[in-house]
């Protein structure tokens, strides 16, 4: 449903989803599958702790990343490749109470985030309903290359948010 083109939540099928399982693994949308048409065969099962080990790496090549992702698969014979955002999902799922991540690129939000004034416009809430739906504030991450750099920056921003507000953010 997140990938339904009529909803405008995922430009050109981009975006990813993940779901945490009780055993410390998670399902993640595999590379090459679109949100609009994905079914149960479009997900790869990953070990959360093994993916989170990437946070300890500083400079990692794309080739090394692929090897580490292969080692983090629940089924080493699974030919599906995890999304480049596997670490971003693992980070989000590692926080207390988070069981599902819907990482989308909504058309209406992208039109706002591409504006030079966006960071300033994001500050503060105007309406009580906005606070209920989006929280007291949002996590804002400046454009960063996808993969490990984006995941690490997102973790830094989430942790800063938690220190400031004492809760995990509702919107990023």
Predicted segments with their positions:
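Glycine-rich flexible loops
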Residues: 1-172
């Amino acid at each position: 449903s997140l990938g339904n083109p009529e909803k405008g939540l995922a430009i050109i099928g981009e975006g990813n989803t993940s779901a945490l399982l009780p055993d410390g693994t998670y399902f993640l949308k595999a590379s090459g599958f679109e949100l609009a048409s994905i079914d149960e065969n479009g997900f790869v099962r990953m070990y959360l702790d093994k993916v989170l080990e990437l946070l300890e790496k500083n400079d990692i090549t794309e080739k090394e990343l692929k090897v580490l992702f292969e080692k983090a698969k629940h089924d080493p014979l699974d030919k599906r490749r995890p999304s480049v955002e596997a670490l971003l999902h693992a980070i989000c799922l590692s926080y207390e109470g988070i069981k599902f991540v819907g990482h989308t690129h909504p058309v209406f939000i992208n039109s706002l985030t591409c504006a030079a004034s966006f960071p300033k416009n994001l500050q503060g809430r105007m309406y009580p309903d906005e606070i209920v739906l989006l929280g007291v504030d949002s996590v804002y991450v400046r454009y960063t290359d996808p993969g490990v750099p984006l995941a690490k920056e997102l973790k830094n921003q989430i942790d800063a948010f938690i220190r400031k507000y004492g809760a995990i953010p509702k919107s990023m």
